[in-house]
Amino acid sequence: MFNDIPVFDYEDIQLIPNKCIITSRSQADTSVTLGKYQFKLPVIPANMQTIIDETIAEQLAKEGYFYIMHRFDEDSRKPFIKRMHEQGLIASISVGVKACEYEFVTSLKEDAPEFITIDIAHGHANSVIDMIKHIKTELPETFVIAGNVGTPEAVRELENAGADATKVGIGPGKVCITKVKTGFGTGGWQLAALRWCAKAARKPIIADGGIRTHGDIAKSIRFGASMVMIGSLFAGHIESPGKTVEVDGETFKEYYGSASEYQKGEHKNVEGKKILLPTKGHLSDTLTEMQQDLQSSISYAGGKDLDSLRHVDYVIVKNSIWNGDSI
């Protein structure tokens, strides 16, 4: 069955323009609804320690962007929820599937977050299904995102368990080496995997990993994503939590994977690596540029909002769109 589907990735695809119907690109609406809430952009900074911290989460929430706080400072999550709610902001946190997480979820009944993401590398697992059911029993009003997965069967099974959205992508990220360490994943065919999974989905899909350019956001939406999680494009900012390093007079920021030894604190079951990215200005500037580029994408799609991107034609060009050039 699988061998019948076309296999391609972001660099293999070009979207085909339609007649523009807006007089200014600024008229294009990039907003998206997830659950009961509307957000400015269909993008989510990856819930990784070198991408997001509580300060950035607060900034994003205040400015109308969606965020997911990482799960690697377990004791701070409950105070974080309280602090966000005291400011009238949404609380969006991550959990794992260890036994202690069940107690933690139950403890949130009096002050439930609006969003919980179940965040493990291989999300098509009984442990994830059990956690979905537990959250939905204890916190029925909380929107549950579950992942990560890479097949339609996984999407359907997590949806049937009660997940409100699923996160698609196993190993395509810049600092993820799952595909090399295990031989498994969606690296090299992430966009095709997204398309495959989205065709089976009844609820929102979040594309996670493999985004290298702003145009890849539009391509993700074309192939079925409601939201797009991005790591490397959000790493390396002045505000980024990653450690600042100076090399030959230039400043860089550390960026490492959630399954790396740098996050784990030990060299065990490592599926991530660390890289240095040149410091690239403020996060707000990147978000503004993303919005402007997405507005341009909507204008090329011949529409007024994100939905227009879902219906454009495309061609598969097999790695030739750069013509040998790099960005």
From Swiss-Prot:
SUPFAM superfamilies with a match to the protein in the record: Inosine monophosphate dehydrogenase (IMPDH)
Catalytic activity from the UniProt record: IMP + NH4(+) + NADP(+) = GMP + NADPH + 2 H(+)
Pfam families: IMPDH
GO MF, one example: GMP reductase activity
Active-site residues per Swiss-Prot or TrEMBL entry: 176
This protein's name: GMP reductase
Similarity comment: Belongs to the IMPDH/GMPR family. GuaC type 2 subfamily.
Protein encoded by which gene: guaC
Domain of life of the source: Bacteria
InterPro entries per record: Aldolase_TIM (IPR013785), GMP_reductase (IPR050139), GuaC_type_2 (IPR005994), IMP_DH/GMP_Rdtase_CS (IPR015875), IMP_DH_GMPRt (IPR001093)
Cleaved signal peptide residues: none
Leading EC class: oxidoreductase
Listed EC numbers: 1.7.1.7
Amino-acid positions noted as binding NADP(+) in the UniProt annotation, renumbered to this chain: 205-228
GO cellular component: cytosol; GMP reductase complex
Stated role: Catalyzes the irreversible NADPH-dependent deamination of GMP to IMP. It functions in the conversion of nucleobase, nucleoside and nucleotide derivatives of G to A nucleotides, and in maintaining the intracellular balance of A and G nucleotides.
Keywords: NADP, Oxidoreductase
GO biological process terms held by the UniProt record: purine nucleotide metabolic process
Native source species: Streptococcus pyogenes serotype M3 (strain ATCC BAA-595 / MGAS315)
